[in-house]
């Protein structure tokens, strides 16, 4: 399991789409530009959903890891 340095973390475990993406969007309003956000989720769609979200919003999708039942995604604002 890779551990990436991150500045902030949100736990969306147990929440279904589109709630995790909404939580990320809300968190991005409150953190400084350049910050790395770690997103912990149980929804298997989170990786592709966040990849697409980052592309549309000019944020950077950094990496992800899967350690079932958790999906962990790192994105930069």
Label each region the model flagged.
Residues 51-77:
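C-terminal structural segments of small proteins and small subunits
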Residues 7-9, 36-38, 70-72:
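Intrinsic-disorder/low-complexity, polar/charged segments enriched in Ser/Thr/Lys/Arg/Asp/Glu/Gln
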Residues 12, 41, 75-77:
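Hydrophobic residues in beta-strands and at strand termini
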Residues 2-31:
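An N-terminal amphipathic alpha-helical segment
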Residues 23, 27-59:
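Amphipathic, hydrophobic secondary-structure cores in small proteins
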């Amino acid at each position: 399991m890779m551990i990436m340095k991150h500045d902030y973390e949100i736990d969306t475990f147990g929440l279904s789409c589109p709630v995790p993406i909404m939580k990320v969007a809300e968190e991005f309003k409150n953190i400084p530009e350049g910050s790395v956000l770690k997103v912990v989720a149980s929804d298997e769609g989170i990786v592709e959903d966040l990849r697409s979200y980052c592309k549309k919003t000019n944020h950077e999708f950094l990496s992800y890891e899967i350690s079932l039942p958790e999906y962990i995604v790192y994105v930069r604002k």
